[in-house]
């Protein structure tokens, strides 16, 4: 392992990266991080290979991928990553900050499409998307809906669907709609005593 890799601090934002917010058309603040190869004067210190947009997964935040993103930057890419609306540093959609929620995936597609237009105009080609898990699903959907037009896409474990145990998707959709109507679709899927996982305070110490 190289000295640079062995000394990488996974718990700190690299000094060469900057965190800001992009304002969506409806005013929502989307957190972003950028590795810009230009020097302080704005001149191009190093001509980039191109521009890379990283899209994280469900419940993710870009801090989980800092070492990978730094690697992309070290190999010559101008790198940007975002936190999806409602997770990470992009606010919450419900009063309970520990409950993930979105009204419809189309909201995320709209955010991505609007962000893409601005990001693409401010960064040199080729424009590449790298996406993980749910980010991979949203990247594929955005491509199909022509919300983005990258020159290349790389997907890591993309969320292609949900296992239905052999039952038709339509049946699962119907059950989900019925349960949502009978209960509260915005509450946590598991009550505190039902969660098949460690308590939140214990999980926090692992990260």
Segments (PLM) and residue ranges:
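Conserved alpha/beta-hydrolase
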Residues: 62, 69-95
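Alpha/beta-hydrolase active-site loop
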Residues: 100-120
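Glycine-rich phosphate-binding loop signature in dinucleotide/nucleotide-binding domains
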Residues: 45-47, 119-125, 148
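Active-site glycine-rich loops that stabilize anionic/oxyanionic intermediates
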Residues: 49-52, 57-60, 134
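Gly/Ala-rich beta-loop-alpha elbow adjacent to hydrolase catalytic centers
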Residues: 130-135, 139
């Amino acid at each position: 392992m190289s000295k640079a890799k062995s000394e990488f601090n996974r718990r700190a934002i690299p000094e060469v990266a900057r965190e800001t917010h992009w304002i969506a058309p409806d005013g929502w603040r989307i957190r972003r991080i950028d590795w810009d190869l230009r020097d302080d004067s704005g001149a191009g210190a190093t001509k980039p290979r191109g521009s890379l947009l990283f899209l994280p997964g469900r419940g993710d935040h870009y801090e989980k991928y800092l070492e990978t993103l730094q690697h992309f930057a070290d190999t010559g890419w101008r790198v940007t990553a975002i936190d999806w609306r409602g997770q990470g540093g992009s606010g919450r959609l419900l009063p309970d900050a520990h409950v993930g929620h979105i009204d419809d995936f189309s909201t995320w597609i709209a955010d991505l499409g609007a962000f893409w237009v601005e990001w693409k105009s401010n960064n040199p080609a080729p424009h590449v998307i790298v996406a993980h898990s749910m980010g991979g699903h949203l990247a594929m959907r955005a491509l199909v809906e022509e919300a983005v037009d990258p020159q290349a896409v790389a997907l890591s474990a993309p969320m292609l669907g949900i296992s239905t145990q052999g039952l038709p998707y339509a049946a699962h959709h119907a059950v989900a709609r019925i349960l949502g109507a009978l209960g509260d679709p915005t509450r946590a899927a598991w009550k505190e005593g039902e969660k098949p996982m460690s308590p939140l305070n214990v999980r926090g110490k692992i990260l």
